[in-house]
């Protein structure tokens, strides 16, 4: 019996230790020095998490000056996250997008405006019925200039709405591309029920709000 009790105590202690490590690992991500992605062939990259990446990908794809948007994961403390793993809420990662854009056409500041203007900025840990830490709102900065832009926009919105803004502000570390079947999901699956009932309506609300930012025929 003593051996059984001892074994149980060891198991509990090990479990508690693992649970204690997760917040510390996540804290290290939040307090890390940002990684700056260099401009390549005149194109810059920005990173955002705002609920389901299918929705966010389609929104940024419609913006003038944006060349490509890739769905993936970022903001967590584990390596090589997958859709299944991120959905457990234990990786720290959120569904995110990589926005590849021409800074001569659209600025990082405008991309942040698109971000706040295309979501429910006060909803914590999700957008709509997509709920959980994997759907939380995060804006990633690569340098202090970007950080100040984000904080200024966030503060102004909080004052305008007289409410707390849910978006977390993280130093960018790494973006992990999602599985191929997630890429261009809205465009490739227009008849999917989620796309019809959630993604397209969200995109249309954004379009009505920011008509001057849209590409032609979008």
Task: Go through each PLM region and give its residues.
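Bacterial Sec-dependent N-terminal signal peptides
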Residues: 1-25
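Flexible coil/turn and secondary-structure edge motifs
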Residues: 16-218
């Amino acid at each position: 019996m003593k051996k059984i009790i001892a074994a149980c105590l060891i198991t509990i202690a090990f479990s508690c230790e693992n649970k204690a490590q997760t917040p510390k690992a996540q804290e290290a991500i939040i307090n890390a020095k940002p990684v700056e992605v260099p401009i390549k062939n005149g194109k810059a990259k920005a990173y955002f998490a705002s609920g389901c990446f299918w929705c966010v990908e389609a929104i940024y794809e419609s913006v003038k000056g944006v060349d490509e948007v890739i769905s993936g994961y970022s903001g967590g403390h584990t390596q090589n996250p997958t859709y299944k793993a991120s959905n457990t809420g234990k990786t720290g990662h959120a569904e995110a997008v990589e926005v590849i854009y021409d800074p001569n056409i659209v600025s990082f500041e405008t991309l942040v405006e698109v971000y706040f203007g295309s979501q429910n900025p006060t909803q914590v840990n999700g957008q709509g019925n997509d709920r959980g830490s994997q759907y939380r709102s995060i804006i990633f900065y690569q340098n202090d200039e970007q950080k100040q832009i984000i904080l200024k926009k966030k503060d102004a919105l909080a004052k305008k709405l007289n409410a707390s803004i849910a978006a977390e502000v993280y130093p960018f570390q790494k973006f992990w591309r999602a599985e191929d079947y997630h890429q261009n999901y809205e465009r490739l699956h227009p008849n999917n029920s989620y796309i019809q009932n959630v993604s397209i309506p969200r995109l249309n609300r954004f379009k009505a709000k920011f008509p001057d930012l849209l590409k032609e025929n979008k």
